[in-house]
């Protein structure tokens, strides 16, 4: 409903309500268009949901998967008979491992692994879709703040998690996929079915390639210079760093959400430290309260965020701190143990409507009835995390099973999730 309300505010009032994987035909002055949305409902998919869009004019079929991660693609074949052009994200925005306090060697190892795993997962989807042409799109992010410029992949760092299109296209070629196309804003590709008629860039081809190769650092520096007034204006609109203590405003915002979210709060399972300049507050999820820290209190998870950012999202009644703060990478974090999916779900569900949806989803997401065999182990077919088909995405190495959809891992000897609290896997040796 968030998107619909925003569109209505812009003047749109004719909407076609649909369901997951249901094809519709829309008629207009230029002819008919078949449309289908593959919907993902999990709180961890985008801001509590994501989707892929399929369009066909009866001759050419395009699947814009963007950064969604569908659990099944059966409807592509059954409804459209295949895909000609596949647009997909291979290098999404995220903050791990860069913002975490950890040894540099560990950060480099995790970054290298994450860089390759993201491209491997995307290649798996490309193989499953089987389109003639693949257009890597929707990423990577570009960091223009001087203090964040090091996050761009422009200095040959194998641990950088934001590879660009040229890097991914080379990965495709290395694995036998020669149908990759490079497009930038303003590029026009003309297709008739699986036939590429033309590909036209807004600037000469050698200049396009230079942006991603020898001239990349200079391009980003020039881009940052052009956008500096825009960034300055945006920051001028932030709330001031100084002001009244933040304890009460955060308490007023968080406590009603905590009281309405048993699954999420119990899933988090411990108090979380929130440092904002000179002030520290504790979000005590087990007790559903926001409070001051106890002397010498230790925490399993903590964040340090500039107070002006917190005051801004509170002032603006922002429902999703993941989108506004965490994805900006303008924060630090520390933790003992693994990633806590429930914690970040809480921060993206700061409205009654959102938290009710997410809590309900977690309450229902426990189907583990089907069983498969993987490398000498019987395991439940659906991943305990987001229900991915482990027959497709599961990889066994020794006594560890990894779901390559999101990179979560389990100890096959115990069924314990090695990535996050909860989410046990039903498994046993064959």
Predicted regions and their residues:
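Divalent metal-coordination and catalytic microenvironments
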Residues: 67, 134, 329
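Cap/insert and terminal regions of metallo-dependent hydrolase folds
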Residues: 73-176
């Amino acid at each position: 409903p968030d998107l619909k309300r925003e569109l209505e505010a812009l003047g749109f009032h004719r909407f076609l309500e649909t369901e997951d994987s249901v094809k519709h035909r829309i008629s207009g002055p230029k002819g008919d268009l078949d449309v289908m949305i593959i919907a993902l409902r999990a709180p961890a998919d985008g801001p509590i949901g994501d989707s892929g869009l399929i369009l066909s004019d009866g001759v050419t079929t395009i699947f814009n998967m963007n950064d969604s991660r569908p659990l099944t693609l059966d409807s592509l074949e059954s409804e459209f008979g295949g895909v000609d052009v596949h647009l997909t994200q291979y290098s999404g925005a995220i903050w791990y491992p860069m913002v975490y306090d950890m040894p540099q060697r560990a950060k480099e190892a995790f970054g290298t692994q994450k860089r390759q795993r993201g491209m491997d997962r995307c290649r798996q989807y490309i193989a499953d879709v089987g389109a003639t042409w693949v257009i890597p799109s929707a990423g990577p992010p570009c960091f223009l703040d001087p203090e964040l410029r090091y996050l761009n992949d422009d200095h040959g760092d194998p641990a950088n998690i934001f590879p660009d299109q040229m890097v991914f296209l080379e990965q495709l070629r290395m694995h036998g996929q020669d149908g990759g196309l490079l497009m930038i804003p303003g590029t026009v590709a003309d297709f008739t079915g699986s036939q590429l008629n033309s590909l036209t860039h807004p600037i000469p081809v050698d200049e396009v390639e230079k942006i991603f190769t020898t001239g990349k650092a200079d391009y980003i520096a020039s881009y940052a210079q052009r956008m500096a007034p825009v960034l300055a204006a945006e920051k001028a609109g932030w709330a001031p760093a100084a002001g009244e203590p933040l304890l009460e405003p955060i308490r007023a915002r968080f406590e009603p959400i905590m009281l309405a979210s048993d699954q999420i709060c119990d899933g988090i399972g411990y108090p979380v430290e929130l440092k904002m300049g000179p002030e520290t507050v504790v979000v005590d999820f087990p007790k559903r309260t926001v409070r001051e820290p106890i002397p010498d209190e230790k925490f399993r998870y903590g964040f340090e965020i500039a107070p002006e950012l917190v005051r801004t999202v509170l002032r603006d009644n922002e429902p999703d701190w993941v989108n506004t703060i965490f994805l900006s990478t303008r924060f630090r974090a520390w933790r003992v143990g693994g990633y806590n999916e429930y914690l970040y779900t809480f921060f993206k569900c700061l409205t009654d409507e959102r938290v009710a949806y997410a809590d309900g989803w977690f309450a229902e997401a426990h189907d583990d009835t089907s069983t498969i065999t993987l490398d000498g182990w019987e395991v439940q077919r659906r991943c305990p995390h987001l229900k991915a088909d482990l027959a497709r995405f599961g990889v066994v190495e020794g006594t560890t099973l990894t779901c390559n959809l999101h990179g979560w891992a389990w100890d096959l000897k115990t069924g314990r999730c090695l990535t996050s609290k909860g989410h046990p896997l039903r498994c046993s040796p064959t």
